[in-house]
């Protein structure tokens, strides 16, 4: 996860490419319950960064936030389907040399124990039937993170054929 970004805007082509990755994501029974809100307005980004008590600050410094929602009335796998779309957008951003961070919204709380989902829903006018899963903050990296150490991979967590 990259949490610090430069002030450089993303090209319209980059934004489109990232969103296409989400739109092309697989979903259970091809019901495609997810819908995305792409936010580039600094004032709205700052507001969204206040959706929960901790962990959402990277949104304020990002060039783009993608709010990942899904229609809860279409399928009981909306969380899984939206998660696949979200991670594919993060992988696409990485492929473009950009940084991103998954900010969990579903099941989290903001000030005065207000559900973060309600805060985001009210801020962006999201209908009640849409579950708000997460917000992806995306931008040009202003930090580098050390990659995972392959020598510390926990292969004992992999089971072949049976437990």
Protein language model annotation of sequence segments:
Residues 1-163:
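Acidic, surface-exposed loops and disordered segments
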């Amino acid at each position: 996860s990259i949490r610090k970004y430069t002030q450089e805007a993303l090209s319209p082509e980059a934004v489109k490419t990232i969103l296409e990755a989400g739109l092309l994501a697989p979903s259970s029974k091809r019901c495609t319950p997810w819908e995305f809100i792409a936010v580039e307005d600094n004032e709205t980004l700052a507001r969204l960064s206040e959706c929960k008590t901790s962990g959402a600050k990277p949104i304020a410094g990002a060039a783009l936030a993608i709010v990942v929602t899904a229609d809860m009335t279409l399928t009981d796998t909306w969380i899984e389907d939206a998660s696949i779309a979200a991670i594919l957008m993060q992988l696409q951003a990485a492929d473009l040399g950009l940084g991103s961070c998954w900010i969990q919204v579903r099941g989290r709380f903001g000030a005065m124990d207000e559900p973060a989902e309600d805060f985001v829903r009210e801020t962006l006018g999201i209908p009640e039937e849409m579950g708000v899963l997460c917000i992806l903050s995306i931008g040009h990296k202003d930090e580098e993170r050390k990659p995972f150490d392959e020598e510390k991979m926990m292969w004992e967590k992999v089971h072949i054929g049976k437990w």
